[in-house]
Amino acid sequence: MMAIAAAQLGYRCHVYEPGRDSVAAEVSAQFTCAPWHDEAALARFAESCDVVTWEFENVPVAPLAPIEGLLAPHPRALETAQDRLKEKRFVEGLGGVPAAYAPVDSAQDLAAAVDRIGAPGILKTRRDGYDGKGQWRIQTARDADAIRVPDAPTIYEGFVEFACEFSVILVRGRDGEVRFWDSAENTHVGGILATSTLPASAMVAEQVPAARDLAAQVAEALGYVGVLTLEFFATAEGPVFNEMAPRVHNSGHWTIEGAATSQFENHVRAICGLPLGDTATTAGQVVMTNIIGEDAQAAHECLGQPGAHLHLYGKRQARAGRKMGHVTRIGAG
C-alpha cells in the first residue's frame, strides 16, 4: 500500500526483503531478495535509493548503520520500539503512563513481579512479539509457577482495566510539522486487531488530546520523520500507553478511503520532504475490518455492500491469525 502510494506520487520503489514471496515487490520497480545482514546486497540496494524507510519494526538495526543517512525515520525509533522495556521507560520519561511493569529474566524475577504488581497480568518477550505472539497470560500467582520463563528477556505487565482501546496516528515532516488523523476505536480478538471504528466513543474523544500530546513529544524526542502510531487504553483515570509502532499502522488503513490523505501517502510525503497532506476524515462513519486467515476466501462477498472497499494483500498462504487483507466500509453517519 505504501509502494502504491509512492507510485502515485511519481516515485519508483525498490523493495529489500529476505523472503521471496514479497507482496510489495509485485507493485514495485525493483526487488532485492537478500538477508538483512548481507552487507554487500544492502549496499547495492542503497546505491539505487534516495531515501529508505521500513514498514515492519522488527528489521535488525545493526545492519542499517552504513545507510543511516538515507533512513527515515531515524533508526533510533526502531531501537526504542523493538524493546518493550526500553520503550516503556522512554515513554515514562516523557510523562506517559504505561501499565505497571517489571523486567523478568528468571522464574524468581517473575514471581517477584507478580507479587509486587499483582495478577492478572501478561508476560511478554521484550523483542519480536506482535499480534499476540510471544505472550503468556497469568491469571493468578499460581499460574506464574507453571510458566517456563523463556531464555530471551521478558517483561511482566499488570492488567489494565480499560473501557476501550484507541490509536493516535500522526505524521511528522522533515520541517517538524505534525498532523494527526482522527483516532479510531479499536477492537482486538485474540490479540489481533479486528476492527477500527470512527467516530470513536465519547470516552475516547475525551482522552485523545492528552494522548496526542504524548505522541507529539515522542515524535519530537526521536527527531521523527514519517508516520508514527501510539496505542492506548482508555481508562477511568485517563489514557494508558500500550505500545508504539514507528511506521504506518493497521489501525490507520481506514485512511485510504476515509481521509483526505492516507497514512501511506503522507508517510511518503514526509520522508521525501514534500508538503504534508490534509488528514481530515472525509466520511461520517468509517469501519475497517481485518480479513484474517481463511476468511479471505469469502472476502469478495463484501463487494455487493454499498460503501465497501476491499483490499486483499496477495499473500500466498492463509494461515490462522494471518492478516490477509481488510475491508473499509464508508457511511454518511
Q: Where are the language model's segments positioned?
A:
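Active-site "cap" helix and flanking loop/linker of ATP-utilizing ligase/carboxylase catalytic domains
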Residues: P209-L230, T235-A236, P246-E294
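A conserved helix-loop-beta module that forms one wall/lid of the active-site cleft
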Residues: G69-W136, A141
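Peripheral (often C-terminal) accessory segments that flank ATP-dependent C-N-forming ligase machineries
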Residues: R269-G333
